[in-house]
Design a protein with these regions (language model features):
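Alpha/propeptide regions of enzymes that mature by internal proteolysis
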Residues: 1-151
Length: 151
């Protein structure tokens, strides 16, 4: 999609990505940067409890914990930031951006990523919904001993 006089392109590959694209395009039309657009678009997916692949309401790991990952890159500055296995933070994309902008690191993971996020003022939240918690409990009771397909 062409935005204004520039040639920014916003693309999504999954059905839930349409709302993400809309948010990113809106950000660009409001004068935001490409980084702002990436962050706002990803944040839509992260906050959508209907999207079980990421973020709030996402499928928990075998321990019943939703862990999230995100990465962001800025080509002109050859910068990148990412987080992995982050727990309890709604918008990992924003934490990844903060890693890129204020940290000497390119990636933070697990407890270190969570500690950094909290130090940067991000709020801790429970990423499980009641529905995903119940689904995990059923899985734990019926399939926990079987082979795993995702964690």
């Amino acid at each position: 999609m062409e935005i204004g006089s520039s040639k920014e392109v916003v693309v999504a590959t999954w059905e839930f990505g349409a709302a993400c694209v809309d948010a990113a395009v809106h950000t660009l039309k409001q004068g935001g940067t490409a980084l702002d657009a990436v962050e706002s678009g990803a944040a839509v997916a992260e906050a959508d409890p209907g999207n079980r692949s990421v973020g709030f309401g996402g499928t928990p790991n075998r321990d019943g914990v939703v862990q999230v990952d995100a990465a962001i890159m800025w080509g002109p500055g050859r910068q990148a930031g990412s987080v992995a296995a982050l727990e309890g933070i709604l918008h990992p994309i924003s934490v990844a951006r903060r890693v890129m902008e204020v940290s000497p690191h390119v990636m933070l993971a697990g407890e270190g990523a969570a500690r950094f996020a909290l130090e940067q003022g991000f709020e801790e939240v429970d990423l499980l919904t009641e529905e995903t918690r119940k689904q995990w409990e059923v899985w734990r009771e019926t399939r926990a001993g079987e082979g795993e397909n995702h964690d």
